[in-house]
Amino acid sequence: MAQGRRRLILSGFLLAAVSLASAEQRPRVGLVLSGGGAKGVAHIPILKLLDELEFPVDCIAGTSAGAIMGGLYAAGYSGVEIERIISGLDWRDFLSDRPPRITAPFFEKRLDGRYQFEFQLRRGLPSTPRGLLAGQKFYNFFSELLFPLPGDLVFDDLPIPFRCLAVDLITGKEAVLKRGSLARALRATMAIPTVLAPVEWDDFLLVDGGLLNNLPVDEVIEMGAGIVIAVDLSGPLDRRDELGSAEKILGQALHIVGRKQNIDKLGRVDLLIEPDMKGLSSSDYFFPDKMARIKRNGEEAARNARAALLALRQKHGLSRSPRRESGGRAGGTGERVLGSVSITGSKNISPSFIARLFGLKPGDPVDADRITGRINELYALRYFENIQYELFPGDGGRVDLRLSLHELPGGNLRVGLRYDNYHKLVAAAGLYATNLPLAGLRWENEVEAAGRTRFFSKLSYPTKTLNFPVYPLVYAGYGDVPTRLYAGDGRVITTYQDRALCFGAGLGFVLKKSLNLELAYETEKMNIHPQAEFVPLESTSPLKPTLRKIEITGTLDTLDDRRSPRNGLLIQGLYEGSFESLGSEAAYELAEASGDVYKTFFGKNTLRLYGYWGTSRGNVPFYKLPNQGRPAAFVGLLYDQLRANEFKILRLDYALGLTRIVQLKLMGNVALGLKDRRPDVSYTPGALWGLGAGVAVNTGFGLLELTYALGSKGAAEPDELRGVASLEIGARF
């Protein structure tokens, strides 16, 4: 967050005293803001109107979205500032707890986008999380906005005294938060059960306050309000024909409970403001047209309330204290000097290890951005469900920092599904364990089934930091993948089962979080099984050899998103050398290198430049030849068709973002320098071409890509074109 947001002009104690002296001459004004999820944006025009009219507010109570808006307002943010903050949010970014991809260690980065579902293993059994989201990004967001308010803050000491409503899952009772971390309080009041994980608060386990008190009128009255202004976003009940989904039915049920609760309270409200929320939902964050409508309806409600507010101001002689006129904000300037760091909640990971990784030491200058950056580094290790911090006054004007952690179990199960029009449906399940049974040990297992069969298990020791420069590794794998073999004119000669069992060991090198190199010795037992007899296969390549080889792989990955990149670089390289001196039954060498560059211009225009180079020498079996026959590498050819001893690819894609989730795509590619030494394949020296267009939709299930391309029919007839359609949806593995 910009440092200017965090500056303060007057201390909260002085301003509270000024406000109290002014309020003694008139009735105290209490503002009540209801919950409503996305509909909470409608509160902002009301806050802006209060600022415009210099209408005093002496205490605030809020629930859920109302508590967030009210809490920021109570802390000293103006209505205009809150509008600027909220309008600048990308709500889709909050759908994942993952920190920016650049902070992830390479071992987690390479799994990004590979699965849709994840389950923690507790006592060896998969378990669902406490919420679909842990809410880490929400906590970071609130902490940055409210830095450096102390963790033992008395909410009455804010520029405007404040109450935040939540519900304790343990007792089933309403929890009125009056003291503690304001950032944690705001995170607690929005914790919709099963959607956002509950928040631990002393002995309480807190969730969304709207379950019991969505319009906390009684709280401002208890704080001494003589005039109550309430903003209710509940809206009318939906008609029968509008209750067509489980979400609508659940929302209606909760709405009925809330309406009953509000009936008794409304008689104590002096001014009730009800923006029109008909047809709008608390989950409309991701629909720009509906969010704009919520804002417009809030502005209309503010216009309608102007006369009533002016009448109240004149009737009671209301005026605002200097606090709001000066724009004072609770806390202090952005940067502080760190006094001490304490860590709570660590069970299996030592506090000293966490402190060393966190990296901030007594005497270091700290601000919200720096602390959040270090927390993201820790969170990216995937050892913690959430990490929260609080500040407390220290000696000599310094601040003491307390990290509160909630650890994840050491193992997890990840599940991914994908579909393409060659392999059809493929499912993948990955079992991953860290620090078990040895601290720093990483065990990765994955099995694929249905359209193709694969199994892979790997043990490595990158240490707990996941960034030790050198680590040992051992692995084993099995594959049984249907693969096509093509003639030069594009006809399918046969389909064979590419079966192999492998074992390997070697060393890995972590050069940076985005750069990795692995060197391994591998033994691979092949068992190629053609579905139809084809004599040239056996005459040129052994079908059941034992290969003993050296493999070197390298990856540089700076992509911002693996599933749908907008910016960044992905470079991959492979060297494979199979030598008779190692006891291999086939002697050959091959090398491949590829590079992907993504760049987005003017927000909606993304260019992708892809290049590939592959070469081989020696007696390379046909099933080991470089293969780029897939739509992500080359459009216009069929799956597995672009395979040869040597070739190069140049490709350019352009994507136009129509919405946040839909892109139109154009693509063109050319394969050059094609050399195929198989006697059964004829080819004409020249280039293979492909031009295509498609659409990509970033669904909740994964990226859906539908492409149609015209491309060369085959290596023997590169100028004869045919159309190829491809469909891919789901995880990327």
Where are the regions a protein language model picked out?
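Bacterial N-terminal signal peptides that target proteins for export
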Residues: 1-10
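Hydrophobic h-region of N-terminal signal peptides that target proteins for export
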Residues: 13-22
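Patatin-like phospholipase
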Residues: 22-63, 71-376, 380-385, 392, ...
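Flexible glycine-/small-residue-rich
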Residues: 166-168, 178, 275, 343-347, ...
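Structural signature of outer-membrane beta-barrel domains
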Residues: 236, 420, 450-452, 477-483, ...
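Gram-negative/organellar outer-membrane beta-barrel architecture
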Residues: 368-369, 373-374, 386-552, 627-632, ...
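C-terminal outer-membrane beta-barrel translocator/porin domains of Gram-negative envelope proteins
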Residues: 412-415, 539-543, 547-677, 681-682, ...
